[in-house]
């Protein structure tokens, strides 16, 4: 018989840097999950990501206090910031530009994000990421 799901916990945790301090500790401690076990497994599974990159994770907690988790790809805004070499987006995106990205960089990000998006069409995903880039105040070339 399948285990009964107690809760779903959504977090963004830095790749390879999960530790029991907030936000991981309190979120998982509330559910009675072994926090150190999660941190150890998460860090092992994210060691091929760039260290410190925020990784969304969805943790399924079962009634017997066991858990499973799904690691998603980093948010598009983080990947765009990295591609443009900026720390954050513009305060007023329509009025100020903070950096430049090329359409090929956007397409590359779309290919990374295809597993997490609700479409398999690379062009549609590219347009979605293009919208994110524009709302961050980035100029798209090409």
UniProtKB/Swiss-Prot annotation:
Keywords assigned? Methylation, Ribonucleoprotein, Ribosomal protein, RNA-binding, rRNA-binding
User: Which GO annotations describe the biological process of this protein?
Assistant: translation
SUPFAM superfamilies, alphabetized = Ribosomal L11/L12e N-terminal domain, Ribosomal protein L11, C-terminal domain
Xref: Gene3D superfamilies: Ribosomal protein L11, C-terminal domain (1.10.10.250), Ribosomal protein L11/L12, N-terminal domain (3.30.1550.10)
GO molecular function ontology, one term from the record: structural constituent of ribosome
InterPro entries per the record?
A: Ribosomal_uL11, Ribosomal_uL11_bac-typ, Ribosomal_uL11_C, Ribosomal_uL11_C_sf, Ribosomal_uL11_CS, Ribosomal_uL11_N, Ribosomal_uL11_N_sf
A GO cellular component annotation here is: cytosolic large ribosomal subunit
Superkingdom of source: Bacteria
Record PTM text = One or more lysine residues are methylated.
Q: What does this protein do?
A: Forms part of the ribosomal stalk which helps the ribosome interact with GTP-bound translation factors.
The subunit field of the Swiss-Prot or TrEMBL record says: Part of the ribosomal stalk of the 50S ribosomal subunit. Interacts with L10 and the large rRNA to form the base of the stalk. L10 forms an elongated spine to which L12 dimers bind in a sequential fashion forming a multimeric L10(L12)X complex.
Under the heading NCBIfam families, the entry gives:
L11_bact
Annotated HAMAP family: Ribosomal_uL11
The family note in this entry says: Belongs to the universal ribosomal protein uL11 family.
Question: Could you identify this protein by its name?
Answer: Large ribosomal subunit protein uL11
Gene from which the chain derives: rplK
């Amino acid at each position: 018989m399948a285990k009964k799901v107690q809760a779903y916990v959504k977090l963004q945790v830095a790749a390879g840097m999960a530790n029991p301090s907030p936000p991981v500790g309190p979120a998982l401690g509330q559910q009675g999950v072994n926090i150190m076990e999660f941190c150890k497994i998460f860090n092992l599974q994210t060691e091929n990501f760039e260290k410190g990159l925020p990784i969304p994770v969805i943790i399924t907690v079962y009634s017997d206090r066991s858990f499973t988790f799904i690691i998603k790809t980093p948010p598009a805004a983080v990947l765009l910031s990295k591609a443009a070499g900026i720390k954050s987006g513009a305060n007023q995106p329509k009025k100020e530009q903070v950096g430049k990205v090329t359409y090929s960089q956007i397409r590359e990000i779309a290919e990374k994000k295809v597993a997490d998006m609700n479409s398999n069409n690379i062009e549609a995903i590219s347009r979605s990421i293009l919208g994110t880039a524009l709302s961050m105040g980035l100029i798209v070339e090409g």
